[in-house]
Design a protein with these regions (language model features):
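Domain-level recognition of soluble alpha/beta enzyme cores
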Residues: 172-198
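Phosphate-handling substructures
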Residues: 13-17, 21-33, 77-139
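Glycine-rich phosphate-binding loop signature in dinucleotide/nucleotide-binding domains
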Residues: 51-54, 148-154
Protein backbone atom coordinates (compact mmCIF):
# COMPACT_ATOMS: atom_id res chain seq x y z
CA UNK A 1 0.00 0.00 0.00
CA UNK A 2 1.33 3.43 -0.98
CA UNK A 3 0.10 6.79 0.25
CA UNK A 4 0.24 9.08 -2.78
CA UNK A 5 -0.27 12.83 -2.51
CA UNK A 6 -1.09 14.32 -5.91
CA UNK A 7 -0.31 18.02 -6.17
CA UNK A 8 -1.13 20.23 -9.13
CA UNK A 9 1.40 22.99 -9.79
CA UNK A 10 0.71 26.57 -8.74
CA UNK A 11 -0.98 29.05 -11.06
CA UNK A 12 1.19 29.45 -14.16
CA UNK A 13 1.36 32.03 -16.94
CA UNK A 14 -0.64 29.93 -19.39
CA UNK A 15 -3.45 29.47 -16.83
CA UNK A 16 -3.89 33.23 -16.76
CA UNK A 17 -3.57 33.59 -20.54
CA UNK A 18 -6.16 30.83 -21.05
CA UNK A 19 -8.79 33.05 -19.43
CA UNK A 20 -8.11 35.66 -22.12
CA UNK A 21 -7.61 33.63 -25.30
CA UNK A 22 -8.74 30.08 -24.51
CA UNK A 23 -6.81 27.05 -25.76
CA UNK A 24 -4.66 29.25 -28.02
CA UNK A 25 -2.64 29.90 -24.86
CA UNK A 26 -1.24 26.36 -25.03
CA UNK A 27 0.50 27.09 -28.33
CA UNK A 28 1.49 30.69 -27.57
CA UNK A 29 3.79 29.83 -24.65
CA UNK A 30 6.43 27.16 -24.25
CA UNK A 31 6.95 25.60 -20.82
CA UNK A 32 5.66 28.58 -18.87
CA UNK A 33 6.72 29.77 -15.43
CA UNK A 34 4.62 30.17 -12.32
CA UNK A 35 3.02 33.56 -11.89
CA UNK A 36 3.61 35.53 -8.69
CA UNK A 37 0.36 34.01 -7.43
CA UNK A 38 1.67 30.53 -8.20
CA UNK A 39 4.92 31.24 -6.36
CA UNK A 40 2.92 32.32 -3.32
CA UNK A 41 0.56 29.31 -3.53
CA UNK A 42 3.45 26.85 -3.54
CA UNK A 43 5.38 28.67 -0.82
CA UNK A 44 2.25 28.74 1.36
CA UNK A 45 1.68 25.03 0.85
CA UNK A 46 5.26 24.40 1.89
CA UNK A 47 4.70 26.46 5.00
CA UNK A 48 1.38 25.01 6.15
CA UNK A 49 1.12 21.44 4.78
CA UNK A 50 2.07 19.35 7.80
CA UNK A 51 2.19 16.04 5.88
CA UNK A 52 5.18 17.23 3.82
CA UNK A 53 7.51 16.17 6.62
CA UNK A 54 6.44 12.53 6.19
CA UNK A 55 7.10 12.45 2.44
CA UNK A 56 9.88 10.01 1.53
CA UNK A 57 10.02 10.70 -2.22
CA UNK A 58 8.87 13.48 -4.53
CA UNK A 59 8.17 12.61 -8.16
CA UNK A 60 7.93 15.68 -10.34
CA UNK A 61 7.16 16.54 -13.95
CA UNK A 62 10.20 18.16 -15.61
CA UNK A 63 8.19 21.13 -16.85
CA UNK A 64 9.18 24.46 -15.34
CA UNK A 65 5.92 25.16 -13.51
CA UNK A 66 6.06 21.84 -11.66
CA UNK A 67 9.76 22.07 -10.85
CA UNK A 68 9.21 25.54 -9.40
CA UNK A 69 6.24 24.27 -7.39
CA UNK A 70 8.05 21.22 -6.00
CA UNK A 71 11.18 23.11 -5.02
CA UNK A 72 9.08 25.78 -3.30
CA UNK A 73 6.99 23.27 -1.34
CA UNK A 74 9.87 21.06 -0.24
CA UNK A 75 12.69 23.60 0.07
CA UNK A 76 13.05 22.98 3.82
CA UNK A 77 12.68 19.19 3.63
CA UNK A 78 15.52 16.74 3.02
CA UNK A 79 13.81 14.51 0.48
CA UNK A 80 14.75 12.99 -2.87
CA UNK A 81 13.09 14.69 -5.85
CA UNK A 82 13.05 12.68 -9.06
CA UNK A 83 12.00 14.20 -12.40
CA UNK A 84 10.11 11.92 -14.79
CA UNK A 85 8.83 12.65 -18.30
CA UNK A 86 5.93 10.28 -17.63
CA UNK A 87 4.45 12.94 -15.32
CA UNK A 88 4.19 15.59 -18.02
CA UNK A 89 0.80 17.09 -18.77
CA UNK A 90 -1.57 15.56 -21.31
CA UNK A 91 -1.05 15.87 -24.18
CA UNK A 92 2.67 15.30 -23.66
CA UNK A 93 3.15 16.12 -27.35
CA UNK A 94 2.11 18.84 -29.77
CA UNK A 95 1.14 21.68 -27.42
CA UNK A 96 4.08 24.04 -26.88
CA UNK A 97 3.17 24.54 -23.25
CA UNK A 98 4.12 20.91 -22.58
CA UNK A 99 7.47 20.93 -24.41
CA UNK A 100 10.14 20.70 -21.74
CA UNK A 101 13.63 22.15 -21.76
CA UNK A 102 16.65 19.98 -22.53
CA UNK A 103 18.09 17.97 -19.66
CA UNK A 104 21.38 19.89 -19.50
CA UNK A 105 19.49 23.16 -19.00
CA UNK A 106 17.38 21.64 -16.23
CA UNK A 107 20.46 20.19 -14.49
CA UNK A 108 22.17 23.58 -14.52
CA UNK A 109 19.19 25.22 -12.84
CA UNK A 110 17.84 22.61 -10.43
CA UNK A 111 20.60 20.06 -9.69
CA UNK A 112 21.30 18.76 -7.05
CA UNK A 113 17.89 19.59 -5.53
CA UNK A 114 16.17 17.60 -8.30
CA UNK A 115 17.54 14.37 -9.78
CA UNK A 116 17.25 14.21 -13.59
CA UNK A 117 18.96 10.84 -14.15
CA UNK A 118 15.77 9.30 -15.59
CA UNK A 119 15.45 11.92 -18.35
CA UNK A 120 16.79 11.70 -21.88
CA UNK A 121 18.66 14.79 -23.05
CA UNK A 122 15.72 15.91 -25.18
CA UNK A 123 11.98 15.50 -24.69
CA UNK A 124 11.21 12.09 -26.18
CA UNK A 125 7.45 12.50 -25.66
CA UNK A 126 7.42 15.65 -27.76
CA UNK A 127 5.92 15.32 -31.25
CA UNK A 128 4.99 18.29 -33.42
CA UNK A 129 2.76 16.23 -35.69
CA UNK A 130 0.74 13.92 -33.45
CA UNK A 131 -1.50 14.60 -30.47
CA UNK A 132 -1.10 12.10 -27.61
CA UNK A 133 -4.14 9.81 -27.44
CA UNK A 134 -6.23 8.88 -24.40
CA UNK A 135 -4.95 5.32 -24.79
CA UNK A 136 -1.37 6.57 -24.58
CA UNK A 137 -2.22 8.63 -21.51
CA UNK A 138 -3.84 5.58 -19.90
CA UNK A 139 -0.69 3.54 -20.54
CA UNK A 140 1.47 6.34 -19.13
CA UNK A 141 -0.59 6.48 -15.94
CA UNK A 142 -0.54 2.70 -15.44
CA UNK A 143 3.21 2.59 -16.06
CA UNK A 144 3.63 5.33 -13.47
CA UNK A 145 1.58 3.41 -10.92
CA UNK A 146 3.62 0.27 -11.57
CA UNK A 147 6.82 2.28 -11.10
CA UNK A 148 5.55 3.62 -7.76
CA UNK A 149 4.43 0.21 -6.51
CA UNK A 150 7.95 -1.14 -7.06
CA UNK A 151 9.52 1.64 -4.98
CA UNK A 152 10.51 1.06 -1.36
CA UNK A 153 8.98 4.34 -0.15
CA UNK A 154 5.45 4.40 1.31
CA UNK A 155 4.62 8.12 1.41
CA UNK A 156 5.15 9.70 -1.99
CA UNK A 157 4.24 13.10 -3.42
CA UNK A 158 3.62 13.65 -7.12
CA UNK A 159 3.87 17.21 -8.42
CA UNK A 160 2.29 17.25 -11.85
CA UNK A 161 -0.59 18.72 -13.85
CA UNK A 162 -4.37 18.96 -13.89
CA UNK A 163 -5.27 16.47 -16.62
CA UNK A 164 -2.57 13.94 -15.83
CA UNK A 165 -3.36 13.93 -12.12
CA UNK A 166 -7.13 13.77 -12.65
CA UNK A 167 -6.63 10.68 -14.80
CA UNK A 168 -4.18 9.24 -12.26
CA UNK A 169 -6.66 9.82 -9.43
CA UNK A 170 -10.04 9.15 -11.06
CA UNK A 171 -9.38 7.44 -14.39
CA UNK A 172 -11.02 10.24 -16.36
CA UNK A 173 -10.32 13.65 -17.85
CA UNK A 174 -12.03 16.51 -16.04
CA UNK A 175 -13.59 19.50 -17.78
CA UNK A 176 -12.61 23.11 -17.15
CA UNK A 177 -15.35 23.55 -14.54
CA UNK A 178 -13.97 20.69 -12.44
CA UNK A 179 -10.23 21.27 -12.58
CA UNK A 180 -8.04 20.22 -9.67
CA UNK A 181 -7.07 22.97 -7.26
CA UNK A 182 -3.60 24.43 -7.52
CA UNK A 183 -1.24 23.37 -4.71
CA UNK A 184 -3.67 21.07 -2.93
CA UNK A 185 -2.74 17.51 -1.81
CA UNK A 186 -5.19 14.96 -3.23
CA UNK A 187 -4.57 11.62 -1.50
CA UNK A 188 -4.72 8.20 -3.14
CA UNK A 189 -4.05 4.92 -1.33
CA UNK A 190 -2.46 2.96 -4.15
CA UNK A 191 -2.78 -0.85 -4.21
CA UNK A 192 -2.48 -1.62 -7.93
CA UNK A 193 -2.22 0.12 -11.29
CA UNK A 194 -6.02 0.09 -11.50
CA UNK A 195 -6.58 1.80 -8.13
CA UNK A 196 -8.56 5.05 -8.33
CA UNK A 197 -9.84 7.50 -5.73
CA UNK A 198 -13.45 8.40 -5.03
CA UNK A 199 -14.37 11.96 -5.93
Amino acid sequence: MKNIYCIRHGTAEHNVLFKEVGEKAYMMLRDSNLTNVGQIESAQMGKYWIEKNNIELVLVSPLTRTLQTATNIFKDVNVTMLALDELKEYPASYENINHRKDRKELVLKYHPTVNFKQLAETDKLWDTENHETIEQLDARVKNMKDFILKRKETNIAIVSHNTFLAYFLYGEIVDYDNELKHCFPYKLRLKSNTTYANK
